[in-house]
């Protein structure tokens, strides 16, 4: 194990270039940026915790939803990919029973006393609650974990739709797993992070984001039994054909007033399921659903029925997307991406709020995407919870400049992220 200064010198000399290239790509421009980024993180660690300490450096990726919009919470399928935007953490184990985490861009140093295992008053919805919950999740698995000091630098920006929270959680989890020799596998780490987010942070999240950051690559997940989801990893190499780039555009609208809108999707789907004797739509016979549409319209309303239609069709579509990726048929995959986007707009109705028709950033982004990409072999769709946030597009390289310029004209400079899929999940880098 090296000191932070030794690692900085090794990185500057290019000794870690092969490792960085495996994570981010091997172009000189990319490597120069990552050398600078890792060196800066190590320097900041020294600033906050002092020089001369032996450290290890970790990476946890963000993720993009590729299919299965609002299907996971109904015990359906999910499809997501890890991306090259990630959180980097420099960490050093300590023996004082405290976890200290300083994150770039945040003024506060999180200090967690591990003798205080229970959720603390006033801590929910803050990063400290995630750290405490993850540590307690390890202990619940019988792992004897202790303190560490860390500095994190995340390129997975908050609100970018790429799950900055899952990247942060997995960064903390991989540090504890490695520094204390716990030996837990990636799915177990993901479940610990979900436990922390649900129980300590106070957000009833699913598991797909954490699984994707933990495992890496493209994940197809069957949530029929959400306590033990079936996970299939599809290798990221070759998923995107030569000359095609994944773009995610942040429409820069706030989710702060949308909790009720998100809840309504789940509530309405489950109201339909209840009419058919199930708790969620994944427990319902689809054939019976179609047979009983008149009764369901009367009892649940048209929007609930349309959202249930979205679930059944999107679930089948997600399985077909998985099959297309395994077969290497990107053209078929792209057609399914478009259909997914149209279903979110027309049936799930989570592209804009009916109560606020003047504000339709996602609608505008999708319309411009269609005008540029239709007939080019590319594809576009909304991703994530909806109503605000981000859209996803697969853009031929010849159209990248035009596409990004159009998005930035609408939503401002820097709104369009050009991404690659990443094979590795959360890992110790050096």
Model-assigned labels for residue ranges:
Residues 135-157:
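Glycine- and acidic-rich phosphate- and metal-coordinating loops
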Residues 140-148, 176-192, 397-410:
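Phosphate-handling active-site elements
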Residues 160-248, 430:
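Fold-level recognition of mixed alpha/beta catalytic cores in primary-metabolism enzymes, strongest
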């Amino acid at each position: 194990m090296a000191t932070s200064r030794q690692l900085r010198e090794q990185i500057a000399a290019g000794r870690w270039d092969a490792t960085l290239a495996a994570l981010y790509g091997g172009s000189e421009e990319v490597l120069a940026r990552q050398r600078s980024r890792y060196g800066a993180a190590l320097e900041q660690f020294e600033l906050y915790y002092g020089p001369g300490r032996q450290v290890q450096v970790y990476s946890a990726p963000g993720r993009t939803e590729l299919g299965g919009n609002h299907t996971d919470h109904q015990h359906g399928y999910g499809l997501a990919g890890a991306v090259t935007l990630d959180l980097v953490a420099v960490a050093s184990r300590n023996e004082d029973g405290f976890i200290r985490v300083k994150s770039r861009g945040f003024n506060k140093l999180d200090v967690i006393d591990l003798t205080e295992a229970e959720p603390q008053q006033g801590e929910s919805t803050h990063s400290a609650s995630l750290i405490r919950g993850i540590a307690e999740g390890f202990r619940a698995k019988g792992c004897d974990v202790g303190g560490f000091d860390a500095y994190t630098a995340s390129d997975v920006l908050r609100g970018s739709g790429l799950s900055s929270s899952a990247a942060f959680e997995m960064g903390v989890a991989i540090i504890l797993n490695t520094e204390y020799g716990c030996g837990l596998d990636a799915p177990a780490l993901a479940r610990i992070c979900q436990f922390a987010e649900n129980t300590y942070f106070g957000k009833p999240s699913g598991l797909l984001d954490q699984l994707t950051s933990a495992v890496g690559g493209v994940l197809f997940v069957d949530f029929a039994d959400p306590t033990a989801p079936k996970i299939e990893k599809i290798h990221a190499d070759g998923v995107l054909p030569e000359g095609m780039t994944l773009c995610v555009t942040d429409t820069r609208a706030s989710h702060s007033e949308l909790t009720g809108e998100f809840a309504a999707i789940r509530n309405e789907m489950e109201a339909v399921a209840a009419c058919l004797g199930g708790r969620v739509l994944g427990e319902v016979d689809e054939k019976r659903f179609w047979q009983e549409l008149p009764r369901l319209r009367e009892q649940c309303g048209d929007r609930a029925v349309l959202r249930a239609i979205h679930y059944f069709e999107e679930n089948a579509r997600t399985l077909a997307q998985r099959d297309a990726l395994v077969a290497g048929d990107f053209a078929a995959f792209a057609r399914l991406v478009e259909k997914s986007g149209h279903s979110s707009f027309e049936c799930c109705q989570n592209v804009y709020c009916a109560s606020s028709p003047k504000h339709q950033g996602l609608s505008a982004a999708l319309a411009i995407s269609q005008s540029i990409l239709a007939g080019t072999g590319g594809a576009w769709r909304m991703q994530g919870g909806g109503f605000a946030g981000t859209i996803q597009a697969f853009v031929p390289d010849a159209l990248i400049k035009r596409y990004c310029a159009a998005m930035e004209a609408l939503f401002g400079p820097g709104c369009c992220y050009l991404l690659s899929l990443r094979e590795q999940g959360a890992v110790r880098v050096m």
